[in-house]
């Protein structure tokens, strides 16, 4: 788990394209405004340009996403400026990826699209029809998928592959979870107001965001201020609609700057200064403290009790036949059929004699496609057919539990947590340096 607060950000490309909602009035207004500017160059990025048409297409997708989330849509000029900055960063990274010789072949793109279709319980042609019904051109969707895969490979090459975590860091992390002072640890319930200002944003944008955050801080510190209402109306985080309530958090799960700030506060007090985090500025209020609910525990893993039905492809059974048979079985199970009986009758896995029961499995044990699908299911829910190297599966989750895990599993969890934290900071630094070394000319007026 990342040791940073999770904040809202304007989505791009593939993520935004997945939203199923009719265009909002704001999106329609954006299209109308952009029509006359369609071919105007709104940014120069090294030897490339971004046009008004490209910008408006992306803005329209994001406006729909915000509406779907019932989040406020920023004023048109502000949203266009934010999205353009993201597109600039994306374009710079694509250029770097090409310079590095990074390519994503068609087979990889098609495999990714197939997984997306499968996750939505559809064949690829059905998924394509849904995307186009949302007003998203399929070629744009495919292009965004290719771009995201390319940028993922670039980040792996330039940043993630260079992150190291020492055994000493792992030992220190585990000790902090169950060390000699663990019994006196307290969980913290916090509320926050977040103003977005990524470290890699232009300095002018950061200055505007800081000015806004300072104004909100003064309002939050004022006598009689309603922090919850202020967060609902002004915070740019996903939890704004909940008044910025983060719930109870252990100190180990929070950025060190936040922990240091609230350590000096009494319940009900607002930290008197802004806290700079990688994505922006934080205003934090301590709601209450309580004794840690599990202060001496080792890092936990979540085990899943799962069963499945496997149909192998080949030996007279085609891909479509295996998938359709599982769709039919799932339909019968959803109508009251017994999963265990179907598994005993049809499954081609060794677990068939146990009704498909795989017992309690830990993270990393099943193949990735199986684990990803399993992790999306609620208790009792049956998946759509899932393709793995073994064939097609129907998966049913029977329950979940926290477990201490083996010493090696605890070390793996600690190493992953430390690595993710380091990688996020390293990526932010690398992206800022990449932008600083690029020629960027913004021709779109900056929203104030």
Curated annotation (Swiss-Prot):
- Main localization is periplasm
Q: Which UniProt keywords apply?
A: Chaperone, Isomerase, Periplasm, Repeat, Rotamase, Signal
The residues covered by the PpiC domain are 185-288, 301-399
Example GO BP: Gram-negative-bacterium-type cell outer membrane assembly
The catalytic activity of this protein is classed by the Enzyme Commission as 5.2.1.8
Report the catalytic activity.
[protein]-peptidylproline (omega=180) = [protein]-peptidylproline (omega=0)
GO cellular component, alphabetical, reads: outer membrane-bounded periplasmic space
The lineage's top-level taxon is: Bacteria
Domain note for this entry?
The PPIase activity resides only in the second parvulin domain. The N-terminal region and the C-terminal tail are necessary and sufficient for the chaperone activity of SurA. The PPIase activity is dispensable for SurA to function as a chaperone. The N-terminal region and the C-terminal tail are also required for porin recognition.
What is the protein named?
Chaperone SurA
Instruction: Give the species this sequence originates from.
Output: Burkholderia mallei (strain ATCC 23344)
* Organism phylogeny: Bacteria, Pseudomonadati, Pseudomonadota, Betaproteobacteria, Burkholderiales
